């Protein structure tokens, strides 16, 4: 959530930053309501001061011996009652204005950082670096991962669709074992890098989704329970970030690093007809997530480290990838700066997103009211939160099935993964 003070004091800058994003955002209604609310607050403050003054004057006069029924005292009391009646009318009006402002501010995305490239969409994303070109397979006859998966008997779409619907898959035998090995491998590398593993709830309440920015704007993209205020998580970022919602952390405990493996659930409402086959775009998929809580002065350095932690997985698996800095037109709602890691999929000859690493600065912390306090200092500050995939497990499987495909129709297991799987080939 943006700071209303920032909107009030720098309206032109805020509007310009919002205009650089995709979508249309107008802060003028917020500014108008804010002016009304502050005027009302000023009036209420003056009336409250007058009410206090009247009470003090009446008390002094009675103390000095003037009869409480004296016309002057009675007039003061009548004025005091009138002031209190007006105050009681203004209070709900001010409360309503604050609620309206809060709802409008909740609908605004984060402001892009100065180091986020200007652009209209993903075409304007800026490539930062590539890694592993020497590992790009030269075999011209590589099958798409869903075809080789079905040939090997490790991927069954037809039966999964029978059980659920389209955009679901069932992993069988060595496929299920490969997924389990990848999850263990990723968590091991992250915990070795200093992340504390957590196993969070897979269902969260509305307040949690609002805190991380999925609600109210993206309700149609999530699965909601019909009879409860619970939603299936779209990413572990939501429950892990909300573990600290409403808390004041000690500065000496920062930074806090967490990693978590969870299934994730997304309706993919805006993706009709895209990536209908395979493991790329599913309603249910597994992912290992990294989440950080850090001091504001360190958050952009922490973003670079976060990207490095995700890259370490791809490098250990010898999977070719590139890092791109997302443009303002492709930036996620809660993020001020995002790097996407895109893995090479030879069957399509394209790089595809496998990780998204974002710095939300104080945007989520402000919505979730997560603060920290330095010892010996007054007041608190909002922490900065970061999150990143480390990695999307299904997409990592897809990349292995294609990049490690052999001419004889088998798939070699990456050397780093072999101890976790107990085999060298599928």
Swiss-Prot record:
Its EC number is 6.1.1.11. It is found in: Cytoplasm. The gene is serS. NCBIfam families: serS. One of its GO terms (cellular component) is cytoplasm. One of its GO terms (molecular function) is ATP binding. GO terms for biological process: selenocysteine biosynthetic process; seryl-tRNA aminoacylation. Keywords: Aminoacyl-tRNA synthetase, ATP-binding, Cytoplasm, Ligase, Nucleotide-binding, Protein biosynthesis. This is Serine--tRNA ligase. Homodimer. The tRNA molecule binds across the dimer. Its main location: cytoplasm. SUPFAM superfamilies: Class II aaRS and biotin synthetases, tRNA-binding arm. Pathway: Aminoacyl-tRNA biosynthesis; selenocysteinyl-tRNA(Sec) biosynthesis; L-seryl-tRNA(Sec) from L-serine and tRNA(Sec): step 1/1. InterPro entries: aa-tRNA-synt_IIb, aa-tRNA-synth_II, aa-tRNA-synth_II/BPL/LPL, Ser-tRNA-ligase_type_1, Ser-tRNA-synth_1_N, SerRS_1_N_sf, SerRS_core, tRNA-bd_arm. Belongs to the class-II aminoacyl-tRNA synthetase family. Type-1 seryl-tRNA synthetase subfamily. ATP binds at residues 266-268, 353-356. Consists of two distinct domains, a catalytic core and a N-terminal extension that is involved in tRNA binding.
């Amino acid at each position: 959530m943006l700071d209303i003070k920032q909107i009030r004091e720098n309206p032109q800058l805020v509007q310009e930053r919002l205009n650089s994003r995709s979508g249309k955002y107008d802060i003028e209604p917020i500014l108008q309501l804010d002016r009304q609310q502050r005027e009302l607050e000023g009036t209420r403050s003056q009336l409250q001061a007058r009410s206090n003054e009247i009470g003090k004057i009446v008390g002094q006069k009675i103390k000095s011996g003037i009869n409480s029924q004296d016309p002057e005292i009675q007039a003061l009391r009548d004025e005091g009652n009138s002031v209190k009646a007006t105050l009681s009318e203004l209070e709900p009006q001010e409360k309503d204005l604050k609620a309206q402002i809060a709802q409008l501010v909740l609908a605004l995305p984060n402001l892009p950082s100065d180091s986020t490239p200007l652009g209209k969409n993903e075409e304007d994303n800026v490539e930062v670096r590539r890694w592993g070109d020497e590992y790009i397979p030269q075999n011209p006859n590589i099958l798409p991962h869903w075809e080789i998966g079905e040939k090997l008997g490790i991927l069954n779409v037809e039966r999964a669709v029978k059980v659920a619907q389209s955009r679901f898959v069932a992993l069988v035998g060595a496929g299920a074992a490969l997924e389990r090995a990848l999850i263990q491998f990723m968590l091991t590398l992250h915990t070795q890098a200093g992340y504390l593993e957590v196993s969070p709830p897979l269902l969260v309440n509305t307040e949690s989704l609002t805190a991380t920015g999925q609600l109210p704007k993206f309700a149609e993209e999530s699965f909601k329970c019909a009879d409860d205020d619970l939603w299936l998580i779209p990413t572990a970022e939501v429950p892990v970030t909300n573990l600290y919602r409403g808390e004041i952390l000690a500065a000496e405990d920062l930074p806090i690093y967490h990693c978590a493996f969870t299934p994730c659930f997304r309706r993919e409402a805006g993706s009709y007809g895209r990536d209908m086959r395979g493991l790329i775009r599913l309603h249910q998929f597994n992912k290992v997530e990294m989440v950080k809580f850090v001091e504001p002065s360190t958050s952009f350095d922490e973003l670079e480290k976060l990207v490095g932690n995700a890259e370490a997985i791809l490098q250990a698996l010898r999977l070719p990838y590139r890092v791109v800095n997302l443009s303002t037109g492709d930036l996620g709602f809660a993020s001020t700066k995002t790097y996407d890691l895109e893995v090479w999929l030879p069957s399509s000859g394209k790089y595809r997103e496998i990780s998204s690493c974002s710095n939300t600065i104080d945007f989520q912390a402000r919505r979730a009211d997560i603060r920290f306090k330095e010892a010996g200092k007054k007041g608190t500050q909002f922490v900065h939160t970061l999150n990143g995939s480390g990695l999307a497990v299904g997409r990592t499987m897809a990349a292995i099935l294609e990049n490690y495909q052999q001419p004889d129709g088998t798939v070699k297991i990456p050397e780093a993964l072999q101890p976790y799987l107990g085999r060298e080939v599928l």
